[in-house]
Amino acid sequence: MKLNEMRKCSLILLGVIFSVSLNDLLGENKYTGVKHIEDEITKERIIKHLDDYRDMISYWRLYPDKFIDYLCSLNPDNTFHFFFYQRVFLRAIMRHRYVYATFVRAWSKSFMSVMGLMIKATLYPGAKLFTVAGGKEQSAGILSSKVEEICKLIPAFAKEIEWDTRGTNAKTRQTKDTVVYQFKNGSTLENIAASEKTRGRRFQAGLMEECVGIDQDVLNEIIVPTMNVSRMINGQVDPNERLNKSQIYVTTAGYKNSFSYEKLLQIFCQSVAKPKDAIILGGSWRVPVVEGLLSKDFVRELKLDGTFNEASFDREYRLLYSLNTKNCWKLLRVA
């Protein structure tokens, strides 16, 4: 369907219907001044514009940054704007099933990764998503802080979450080491433990935060198998749906003889053999410096600091994996 044929459509989004033209939706990503009016959702309205809704949701799944641009346009006091590399990252994690991203400090990797999961939870009703890190309390802190930050910057996201925790049904819960967000469309986003306690759980997609700290056996034997069940649509599975079994690995650089480095090489080989399924992403300190997220003077001072280990600087800011000399020496002695 051409854009001019879809000129006026009522957009169902976040529990309310907004009157907006598709050209406004897909055009320039600025606040248009259009006054959005809340109205009652009816089954008849949904059926009448169902094809239009399908087209828009399909578009947003491929261009998630445009979805965020639209949500921001609903807020006249919006202050959130993407950097170019953040748009690239969002599109990559929505279009590929396997993503390995190695980024430096101040790259906003956790912020963007959690935003990607929230987009998936919104655009894929009934999705079961998780985050995991080396420690459960660590993953709970990352998830809760980033969701809270995103909801403040983009209030429309807050309307997608069931915040009432007083009901008998399990909804949004937040404790020291457990965070569960229940979305109004049936999706859930939670943190899980990198331990035997997670065995038997079922999800469709997950984020491995700071995967350099996750145990190899736990990841392969417990975490990855939780994603063996695909999302059902009307009782059927779409084999082409990118959500199913999608895995995002995010970390800073570590050691070359570690499991995380082997996983990086594995997904790199997958990206060569099947470029539509896997992708490798990376960025040094220069990217956040160019965008103003990191001070160049701060980086220069770190490089000149005699107490700062050069190998640590290479891992944290130059995206260079180090050779673990201790393990290497043990291997030489055994040989």
Language model region names:
Residues 2-335:
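Phosphate/NTP-binding elements of NTP-utilizing enzymes
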